[in-house]
Amino acid sequence: MNYTKVYNNLIKKGKLRKLDKSKLNFYTEKHHIIPSCIGGNDDSDNLVLLTAREHFIAHWLLAKIHYNSPGLIYAWWSFYNFGEDSLGRNLKLTSRGYQLVREKFSKIHSNTMKEMWKSNEYREKRSITLSLPEIRAKISESQLEAQNKPEVKEKISKGVKAAFKRPGVKEKHSAAVKKSLNNFEAKKKQSNSSKIRQRTGKHWQDYDLLYKLWIKLNRPKRGSFGTYISKLGYPKSNYHRLIVQFNEDYERSNNENCS
């Protein structure tokens, strides 16, 4: 098919109507003969009135003629998704037509986004936008809403089950979980050590020594332990926080030995 010839004939037909809609007794839409995305202007000689069906066909032909124009492919895609005929009915789309426009639109959209992400300015603006509390809240709300839908849950479940059936996936997941848990425990230890270092007092300075003594005495309660170490020159106190820390370290040590 000679798409250019068909397009020109369609435009000639539309030109006969002029541009005054009030003189027509049927629905029409204004169409740029040379679309603005490829250099067209808004002058009257570049405009024509087409019926909804003709307008749809015109953009289909333009997408065929200018196959690598992102703007025209997007316009074509928009007609397929949002177009209506003169009676307000959604424009029907064949499976072949849908596949063609979807694949082309997807490819062009992907290339466009790749080019945009190469721009430092775009990445910076995107980062600022996504960091806004109201935007983050909307994204989170949208994701939670989507994940709570039964069909989405089922799809996720099937995807996870299928993934675990692939060779090596289960082993990799297990290793990642163990690594994550080890990192968590290491950070927790570091955090506790930091807290201990930040505390003042002779009993905190001698923490390791007193912890070993507490273990040797069969982990006495704070009153008994306080009385014992006061005889060693430490101030009289109930040592509540010290014993709490001892118990946390003791439990953690036992858990590590059992794992």
UniProtKB/Swiss-Prot annotation:
Keywords, ordered alphabetically: Endonuclease, Hydrolase, Nuclease
Metal-binding among keywords: no
Keyword Nuclease: yes
MF term (GO), any: endonuclease activity
Family under the similarity heading: To phage T4 mobB and mobC.
Protein name listed in UniProt: Probable mobile endonuclease D
Lineage start: Viruses, Duplodnaviria, Heunggongvirae, Uroviricota, Caudoviricetes
Gene name as annotated: mobD
